[in-house]
A protein has these predicted regions:
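Juxtamembrane intracellular "pre-TM" segments in multi-pass secondary transporters
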Residues: 2-9, 203-241
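Helix-loop boundary and gating motifs at the non-cytosolic
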Residues: 2-59, 106, 236-275
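Helix-to-loop junctions at the C-terminal end of transmembrane segments
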Residues: 64-78, 285-299
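Structural signature of the two symmetry-related core transmembrane helices
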Residues: 81-96, 301-316
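Helix-loop junctions at membrane interfaces in 12-TM secondary transporters
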Residues: 98-111, 318-330
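Intracellular juxtamembrane helix-capping segments at the cytosolic ends
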Residues: 121-135, 339-353
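Glycine-rich segments within core transmembrane alpha-helices of 12-TM secondary carriers
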Residues: 143-165
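C-terminal membrane-cytosol helix-exit motif in multi-pass small-molecule transporters
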Residues: 157-170, 188-208
Length: 353
């Protein structure tokens, strides 16, 4: 039922579920582990390039497929089914990182690309289900609730994973490397378990009659061609998407590459992990507060403010030389990052035809 507490919470818990991947894998352990365990080169610049290439390949593939699979989902009323498919693609690939042995960077980056595709593609359909659980006046609050739960949920599991890494023997684990590999398994389990509420309690409204997958593909392709032919009629949407593609790619780059960047300039793993935990636990309340801020000055003005603030902080990040600088940046990043993500999702849901 739309606007029911149960459906809104069930939808929001998917953020809690998949943010474990964003935190423990994408932002936390994978960049460091890839550089120090899987990579076979002593050249830190080259390992950073491999990691950036993996992120770029995943992003390009998702960007290329998104309009087509989105159109198929619209015509076949299959957003939820496609969300589940891509979520479990990501879950299986994340769990697969457990089997990758030291030095096998090619297999590690392959699993990472597949998991990232599952994560990002799943989010396309997760975002598209927002109107199924909330009306327009509740978009900002519901979207912000999802991201805030994502930060606290991802942060909690990451904290457990960090403790496993720092004190492996306390958990019955032989060493830190095994602890990190087990962390990837824990992310897969966390992602799967906390996806269950959405699977059970979020009902996708039936917009079109159910059709076969082949009919959905045909109708989806026709819809995509039709939309592209009328692109000039959707100037607001196109303008927003172009801007969003640019600024959110910057946000995603910071999330994915910050730890690798800090490691490359000589910061200790413990300092980088501490900074990442700071982001998670500061962003949890900050995202909710930013939602209230948006109601005061308007969603677009709040989004402009967040983007400008985030940009200035990122510029300062280029001049970081001490570890305490990294902590300061982490706190300020946390103040704006969740707001950018949540309000962008809410605004896009409002303006799509």
């Amino acid at each position: 039922m739309i606007n029911s507490k149960k459906s809104i919470l069930a939808w929001s818990l998917y953020d809690w579920a998949n943010s474990a991947f964003a935190t423990t894998v994408m932002a936390g352990f994978f960049p460091v582990f890839f550089k120090e365990y899987w990579s076979t080169t002593d050249n830190v610049t080259l390992s950073t390039w491999y990691l950036g290439l993996g992120n770029s390949i995943a992003s390009i593939l998702v960007a290329a497929l998104a309009p087509f699979i989105g159109a198929i989902a619209d015509r076949g009323t299959a957003k939820k089914k496609l969300l589940i498919f891509f979520a479990f693609l990501g879950i299986i690939a994340t769990g697969g990182l457990w089997i990758v042995n030291q030095g096998h960077w090619q297999m590690a980056i392959l699993f990472y690309i597949i998991a990232s595709i599952g994560f990002m593609s799943g989010n396309i359909f997760y975002d598209a289900l927002l109107p199924a659980v909330a009306t327009k006046e509740k978009y900002d609050h519901t979207s912000s609730l999802g991201y805030s739960l994502g930060y606290i949920g991802g942060g909690l599991l990451f904290l457990i994973n960090v403790l496993m890494y720092l004190q492996p023997h306390s958990f019955g684990i032989p060493d830190g490397a095994t602890a990190i590999r087990l962390s990837f398994l824990s992310v897969a389990a966390w992602w799967a378990i906390f996806s269950i509420p959405l699977i059970l309690f979020v009902k996708e409204p039936k917009v079109h009659d159910s059709v076969s997958i082949f009919s959905s593909i045909k109708a989806g392709w026709s819809q995509l061609v039709s939309t592209l032919s009328k692109i000039r009629e959707y100037k607001v949407v196109v303008t927003f998407l172009m801007a969003y593609w640019l600024y959110i790619d910057g946000v995603d780059t910071i999330i994915r590459m910050a730890v690798d960047y800090g490691s490359s300039i000589g910061f200790s793993a413990s300092s980088l992990i501490t900074a990442l935990l700071l982001v998670q636990f500061v962003a949890f309340p900050a995202t909710l507060v930013y939602s209230r801020f948006a109601t005061k000055i308007g969603i677009k003005n709040a989004l402009y403010t967040a983007i400008i603030g985030y940009t200035l902080i990122t510029i300062f990040g280029a001049f970081v030389s001490k570890e305490w600088h990294f902590y300061v940046i982490a706190v300020f990043i946390a103040c704006f990052q969740g707001g950018i993500q949540a309000l962008s999702r809410s605004l896009y849901t409002r303006i799509i035809p």
